[in-house]
Amino acid sequence: MRKHYNNILKKFFWLKLIKSRTKLHLTQAQMSRKLIMEERSYIELDHGNACCSALTLALFLIYCCEDPMQFLAELKVEFEK
């Protein structure tokens, strides 16, 4: 059951990450610095090959997400489908 939610989060976060990076006009390297992570690790997120850690999610919500409450509301909807 937990793996199911992890897969939902992975896909949801990936879509939001790409949208945010595009909107902020940042390169992968710039986004990795904003999220305080190695560029190689960021690229794995950017390609949808990895799921975010709790720290990465928190940094994204604080520094990159236009509306964190909307993000969480939309994620809740995905979890409840």
PLM regions with names:
Residues 1-23:
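A short, Lys/Arg-rich alpha-helix, primarily the initiator
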Residues 2, 7, 69-81:
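Short, charged recognition helix plus adjacent turn
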Residues 20, 34, 45, 74:
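Residues in the recognition helix of alpha-helical DNA-binding motifs
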Residues 25-44:
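Short alpha-helical DNA-recognition segment
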Residues 21, 32, 61:
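The alpha-helix within a helix-turn-helix
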Residues 17, 28, 39, 54-57:
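Helix-turn-helix DNA-binding elements, focusing on the entry/boundary residues of the two helices
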Residues 53-71:
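DNA major-groove recognition helix of helix-turn-helix/homeodomain DNA-binding modules
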